[in-house]
Amino acid sequence: MPKLKTRKAAAKRFRATGTGKIVRRKAGKSHLLEHKSSDKKRSMSKTTLVHERDELNVRLMLPYL
């Protein structure tokens, strides 16, 4: 059986934790930041877990994660 290919776009966006959960960065912190509050920008800097309903799709895109 041939090797499974990894979706490179997904590989750049998702990482696995030590316990196997998938983490992602929050969107909206690359530009147009001037009108956003400091609290908003600080909360967007943190990583968050991928929702359980999206986790299967991410795992299919990253077979070796």
UniProtKB/Swiss-Prot annotation:
Q: Cross-referenced SUPFAM superfamilies, in alphabetical order?
A: L35p-like (SSF143034)
Segment Disordered: which positions? Answer: 24-48
Keywords from UniProt, A to Z, are: Ribonucleoprotein, Ribosomal protein
Q: Where is the composition biased (Basic and acidic residues)?
A: 31-42
Question: Is Ribonucleoprotein there in the keyword field?
Answer: yes
A GO BP term, please? translation
Q: Might you report a single GO cellular component term?
A: cytosolic large ribosomal subunit
Which is one GO molecular function term here? structural constituent of ribosome
Q: Which InterPro entries match?
A: Ribosomal_bL35, Ribosomal_bL35-like, Ribosomal_bL35_CS, Ribosomal_bL35_sf
Transmembrane segments annotated in the record for this chain: none
State the family named in the UniProt similarity comment for this chain: Belongs to the bacterial ribosomal protein bL35 family.
* Protein name per Swiss-Prot or TrEMBL: Large ribosomal subunit protein bL35
Native source organism of the sequence: Nostoc punctiforme (strain ATCC 29133 / PCC 73102)
Gene name linked to the record? rpmI
